[in-house]
């Protein structure tokens, strides 16, 4: 599996429409999608899944108003329940086979451990894309979401115990079996296991809210400065694990701390706001920001870590009320050399 910073041929998104996810915020959430597409489209093709032609017309009109590079945007009528393409969409891999260098893994999606049974319908999206793309598909008898794995493209994968060892995913599998499965399906030789995710994350601790590779030897990890915050202990333990972890070559990683925004709530429920939920695309990095005092620091740190890309902050206060942000709703399709 290539690292996210490797060249993309496309980014995949689903157009927001679920009022249960955003009962009062759907209009502002859609504006963030327009911003994402506008920033990404000059650098790679953007595929947007829509439920109906009326939605496609709306997206086209809004992109034209935003003066987006619409020639690089393709709208596809493929129904979805919600927008979390990272988790239910295909996980692309590249291969040495010259006739079919691009393929993807199709995992079982069970609505994040059965929390949202109706969301299991989104498992069909990967199958729909398989018939559209005409690439080899590796279908696996394991529950897994794309947001639970992070790779450096050189042989190392990050994940969390809270998610992949959760009894609501694959209770029949041992840790060693899951470890071996990740190695086989992602083409990695080493798996680094972190512990717990952040409070408010209904995915049971996805790695893409916690720690992210920014190059083959460097990982950025969120830390909580307030020792009284409920995230403090979990994040300190994750940071300590990364400090002693080694990559596929047995070398220690460079670990860069990334701050946490102050706690955010919606209806009394804590939200999983995290600067680690950024998306690395061709030429740009899209970062969720939250009208928070730590926004500028986080953007500055990430710009230093990505000197050859332009880092853009997108206000995600309303998006994260749906319990996810930018990385959760994007899926990269890597370039595959023939």
Where do the model's predicted regions map?
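The feature marks the mature, well-folded catalytic cores of soluble enzymes
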Residues: 1-338
